[in-house]
């Protein structure tokens, strides 16, 4: 929900304010400078490295028509150019690309990049400069899901699931014809960490997938406002107190071509979330949540028969339970896994065995684990990002707008931070395949962006890749203030952000715009660049408004 107060008054009053009298010689922004899609907006975004990612322990990024590569102790060099890529495409009879495509890394241990172009998916070995795989795609295919273990590609066409082999043979997994039944797509309104509808087994012998029947759900009259003339696009949306969709999980065996359905039972109106395969491919784990969203069961099913094997444990809360992350098995112990839960009020890590017994709590405190980045090569250490305050700062938990990255010793249960900062700052990190190195993209209210390669064992910067300049230099900038107010319970802290008008005179009253987005998982006040202030807020503050 977005609330803007006195919008008409704001727009009308803009013409009455003399910007030059307020800002002296400092330059002013236009809306084109600050609003996404503006003609000059890209000039005012802190510089970045395009498509920065790991391929093994080599980092890659696009610079112009070249892919640059580097290692922790070696200088950056050109890995390949667009011309070389087009030469490789010509060898297999494919059309050239007019610009560098968007690349992904399909294999952890191979110098191969994947990209889509001209209705094909290509796998390109940039060391040998050759196309090693070429998949023929149809423009109507969606939800592509590649399996590195077998080279197969799952996809949906309309509302059915199919599989494309490395030799471009198509297998039909589902053939649903009833209206309102969809297979292989994301379900449950993309809640509870769900972002796709297919799940390859570790060795690629089977594919688990969602089947959703929403024929009983009422159509809600959404409108597509992106079209030249707005048009109706009805969408199945389960309203409170009305019928919801029914979801089941199928397991397709590539060798037999047959599907086994998991016997998830009654009630049918429940949420099947966070699907995970066991390392031996014999079982599937599902976090099952009731429709009231206050009771979750972690259940294991046989992937061979569909039978329920065991209900491992239950989480209940009078307010809500929200499973967001699948179980994560330890790489060197298939009988133990990590579970994320907010059972103590903050999202933390817990170590379990496959009998459902909690072995230990791995993290604790008045801070949140945000993401698990991966393990080291030996599987003895885990890397995670969190809001835990930097050990270099002297402030208590809950007072910071800080995100850092830590290394956790799984045996000892102790962790330490690899990144560092002050009261505010955000470290967005990527872990290399071996866990030896991390890419650290750091920003703070007064730091546009710094990108470094850091050591995965100790807090040490090995190489700085980028130090971005302040894109607002020379412009009149408002003062940005952050702080906390108490919620209605008088205890809970709520972050706020205040953008003061440029040239503020504290003896005067100013028109004020209150901006609130009350949705879940949407923290607008951050410790990053300018505390997450948007361009429109800055534009209005330059014109005499409190935002």
Predicted segments with their positions:
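Bacterial Sec-dependent N-terminal signal peptides
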Residues: 1-27
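Serine-hydrolase catalytic core recognition
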Residues: 34, 218-219, 281, 420, ...
């Amino acid at each position: 929900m977005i609330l803007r107060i006195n919008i008409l008054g704001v727009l009308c009053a803009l013409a009455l304010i003399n910007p030059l009298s307020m800002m002296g010689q400092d330059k002013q922004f236009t809306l084109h400078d600050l609003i996404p899609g503006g003609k000059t907006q890209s000039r005012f975004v802190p510089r970045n490295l395009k498509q920065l990612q790991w391929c093994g322990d080599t980092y890659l990024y696009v610079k112009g028509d070249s892919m640059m590569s580097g290692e922790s102790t070696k200088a950056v060099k050109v890995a390949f150019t667009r011309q070389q890529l087009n030469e490789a495409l010509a060898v297999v009879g494919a059309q050239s690309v007019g610009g560098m495509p968007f690349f992904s890394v399909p294999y952890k241990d191979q110098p191969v990049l994947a990209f889509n172009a001209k209705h094909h998916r290509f796998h390109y070995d940039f060391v040998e400069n050759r196309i090693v795989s070429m998949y023929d795609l149809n423009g109507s295919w969606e939800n592509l899901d590649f399996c590195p273990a077998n080279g197969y590609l799952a996809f949906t066409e309309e509302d059915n699931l199919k599989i494309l082999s490395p030799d471009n043979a198509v297998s039909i997994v589902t053939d649903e014809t009833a209206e309102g039944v969809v297979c292989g797509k994301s379900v449950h309104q993309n809640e509870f960490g769900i972002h796709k509808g297919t799940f390859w087994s570790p060795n690629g012998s089977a594919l688990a997938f969602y089947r959703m029947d929403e024929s009983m759900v009422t159509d809600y009259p959404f409108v597509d406002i992106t079209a030249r003339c707005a048009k109706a696009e009805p969408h199945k949306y389960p309203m409170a107190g009305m019928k919801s969709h029914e979801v089941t999980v199928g397991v397709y065996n590539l060798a037999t071509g047959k599907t086994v359905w998991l016997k998830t039972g009654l009630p049918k109106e429940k949420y099947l979330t966070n699907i995970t395969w066991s390392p031996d491919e014999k079982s599937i784990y599902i976090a099952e949540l009731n429709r009231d969203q206050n009771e979750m069961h972690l259940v294991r099913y046989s992937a061979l028969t569909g039978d329920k094997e065991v209900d491992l444990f239950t989480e209940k809360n009078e307010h809500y339970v929200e499973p967001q992350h699948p179980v994560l098995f330890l790489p060197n112990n298939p009988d133990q896994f990590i579970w994320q839960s907010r059972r103590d009020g903050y999202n933390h890590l817990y170590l379990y065995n496959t009998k459902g017994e909690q072995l230990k709590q791995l993290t604790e405190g008045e801070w949140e684990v945000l993401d698990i980045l991966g393990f080291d090569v030996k599987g003895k250490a885990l890397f995670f990002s969190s809001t835990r305050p930097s050990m270099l700062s002297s402030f208590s938990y809950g007072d910071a707008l800080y995100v850092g990255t830590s290394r956790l010793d799984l045996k000892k249960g102790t962790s330490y931070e690899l990144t560092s900062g002050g009261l505010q700052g955000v470290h967005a990190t990527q872990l290399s395949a071996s866990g030896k190195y991390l890419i650290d993209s750091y920003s703070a209210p007064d730091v546009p962006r710094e990108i470094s390669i850091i050591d995965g064992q100790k807090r040490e910067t090995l190489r700085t890749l980028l130090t971005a300049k302040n894109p607002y230099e020379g412009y009149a900038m408002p003062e940005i203030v952050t702080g906390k107010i108490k919620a209605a319970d008088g205890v809970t802290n709520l972050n706020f952000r205040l953008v003061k008008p440029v040239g503020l005179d504290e003896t005067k009253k100013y028109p004020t715009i209150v901006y609130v987005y009350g949705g879940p998982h949407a923290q607008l006040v951050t410790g990053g660049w300018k505390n997450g202030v948007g361009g429109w807020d800055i534009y209005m503050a330059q014109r005499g408004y409190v935002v």
